Amino acid sequence: KPKYYNPESVLQKSGHGSYVETPLGEVYLVHLCARPFAPELRCTLGRETAIQKMKWTEEGWLRMYDDDNLAKEYVEESKLPEYPVPQIPDFDDFDGDELGNWYYAPRIMPQRFADVKARPGNVRIRGQESRTSLNKVSILARKLTSVYAKVTTKMEFKPETHQHSAGLIMYYDNMNYINLRKYYSQTLGQSALSIIHLENGTKTELLNTRIPVADGPIYLRLNIEG
């Protein structure tokens, strides 16, 4: 909400923290936050995680290390030895025994509908309810950490009725998304590609982008440029 926006801080909505104390006695707070874009103040990247260096005062109060009250983008690192962790891969050919833990789905575990064992080298996604549902939706997603990205996927899908669709989606929530989808077009009498844009629950189908397509493998790409 605009009345809670502080233009002096890049990180907004900071809260819901987890307390961390290292073996060296260093104190940190890991917390949720968001980075809204001006002037709309919309948090396009959703909830993010930040870390702050903290300290205990002589009176027993937990305070930020620099005695400020604004969340910082950059903090002093711990003096503990580095502990490397695997980086999230830019490419996934789904040839492992299980789905990577960097995948998410709205409100349910993605393993409930996404299977990497049925056809090695592919992920098979079982359809469920519509994209606007608050219950069971088959959206296999990765979190964006930047507003500049290129996302590409190869898909095999043959829709048989107008209720069948699959594709590539840029998803904020069930009322806000952009979906490049393959579906069965009753108008064309065959499979087609089109783009659906949902903003605050209002749906716009960009019919000028609709094109007929064959039912073989197809590549879909999404370019995000700020």
Model-assigned labels for residue ranges:
Residues K1-G226:
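Carbohydrate-active catalytic/glycan-binding domains of CAZyme proteins
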